[in-house]
């Protein structure tokens, strides 16, 4: 990822979970430990079905007295509705701020050049009062900034970053085995642990109960996966017979 490039991810949506019960509310639902998340630490997490199947994944960022969920925009309304069904009597407010906030990704080295930044997965700081963090899944995905649309371009200009084709970013992501697009096609088809969520730091096996925790722990204890998401590269051409004929 070039140090001068930035990828404005307009296909990302933002939910804001706020209120006195916001921490407890998320802790009882998501696969990661919300207590890890603070002003200097963000995390990757998922919301699973009661059977432990994949439903949604997102990055959790501390924001004021609540939390921002950075997720794929095409399923942000689904995630919003699912969270509302779990709300019950919890004193929380769930807002869809996708029209107010924008997410952008940029180079790992560029992130480290920001004052106060640390080379730690999920490390979070502020730049021009906006949240900037090192992607909690893989450092090669670089830094992320979550900002109000008007302020975003001011921050990017100040950082001397030029907008580039987001396909470059997603190509890198897929090569790393981290799909971020059309995730609704995986819903209810794979267990969360089969989506490489352990390797991507999305599951905390030491935290208490959450939705789908029982099957997730059972599969982990068996230490055997029947399926797993992997990147696949398709090349043009034909295979010569001598390349696949054994003696």
Can you name each region flagged by the protein language model?
Residues 1-242, 246:
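Basic, glycine/lysine-rich polyanion-binding surfaces/domains
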